[in-house]
A protein has these predicted regions:
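Conserved catalytic or regulatory cores that recognize and/or transform ribose-phosphate-containing ligands
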Residues: 1-151
Length: 151
């Protein structure tokens, strides 16, 4: 999320709408939750804190981590994860997948990397690995909607 275009907001918004419309599933969206945490701060100023005020920066990131992992462990029934080149510079997605695996939450991974670049750890945590969102929708529809028609 930290290094993804728009924090990954676009794909999350799209899949959130599909999940609600087709499966009646609610979503914890870390982008939305981060925006709530950041509403009192200027985003550019916040990003500068990584160098100018690391203590303050870490304090806010820790709030996001706690909220995020609490959602994975205590609120989520399953995890949807986009695995692409943006994960190489971050750690949150790795942690979410690992925590979800440890707590026996299904993990649906949309892999956009060559298979040789997909970490064996992440590959082994995933319940299902697909290459695109349309394939994910088929998997989720079959699992949670008994394969009924979806839009």
């Amino acid at each position: 999320m930290e290094n993804a275009k728009d924090g990954g907001a676009d794909w999350r918004k799209d899949i959130t709408l599909w999940l609600l419309d087709n499966l009646d599933h609610g979503v914890f969206d870390p982008v939305v939750e981060s925006q709530k945490l950041m509403k009192n701060y200027d985003e550019e100023e916040f990003r500068r804190w990584k160098q100018t005020d690391p203590k303050k920066y870490v304090e806010i990131i820790r709030l996001a981590i706690k909220k995020d992992l609490d959602a994975v462990v205590n609120k989520a029934d399953y995890i949807i994860c986009l695995w692409d080149k943006n994960v190489f510079k971050g750690a949150g997605t790795h942690s979410e997948v690992t925590f979800a695996y440890y707590y026996d939450k299904p993990i649906y991974l949309i892999n956009k990397l060559p298979i040789n670049d997909l970490s064996g750890w992440i590959m082994s945590c995933a319940t299902e690995i697909v290459n695109d969102f349309e394939s994910l929708k088929v998997v989720l529809n079959n699992k949670y909607n008994n394969g009924k028609y979806w839009s």
